[in-house]
């Protein structure tokens, strides 16, 4: 009976170790595991930085749009610089 209980003990320990190994594999390497979690966490941080940068750009562009709508001098200045706009009767000189 000693051999029988001894073999039962070894089988029990083997099953417990196998279950622990399966759970550890699931913890580290599955789709919901720690390694996947770390990769997703890095991705979220990167995307949050990108969103913050784009929000700042949007604020700058919005302020530019507001200034263009409210001040015709700003609009005229921008048209002169970027599109070469000149008024009737003006002469444009390009100095290089």
Swiss-Prot record:
Keywords from the named record: Cell cycle, Cell division, Cell inner membrane, Cell membrane, Membrane, Transmembrane, Transmembrane helix
Keyword Cell membrane: yes
Name of the featured protein: Cell division protein FtsB
Membrane-spanning parts: 12-29
GO terms classed as biological process: FtsZ-dependent cytokinesis
UniProt topological domain (Periplasmic) ranges: 30-96
Phylogenetic lineage: Bacteria, Pseudomonadati, Pseudomonadota, Gammaproteobacteria, Thiotrichales
Family the entry assigns: Belongs to the FtsB family.
A GO cellular component entry from the record: plasma membrane
Membrane topology according to the record: Single-pass type II membrane protein
Subcellular location: Cell inner membrane
Domain of life: Bacteria
Subunit structure: Part of a complex composed of FtsB, FtsL and FtsQ.
Matching HAMAP family: FtsB (MF_00599)
Pfam families (UniProt xref): DivIC (PF04977)
InterPro entries (alphabetical): Cell_div_FtsB (IPR023081), FtsL/DivIC (IPR007060)
Main function: Essential cell division protein. May link together the upstream cell division proteins, which are predominantly cytoplasmic, with the downstream cell division proteins, which are predominantly periplasmic.
Residue intervals annotated with topology Cytoplasmic: 1-11
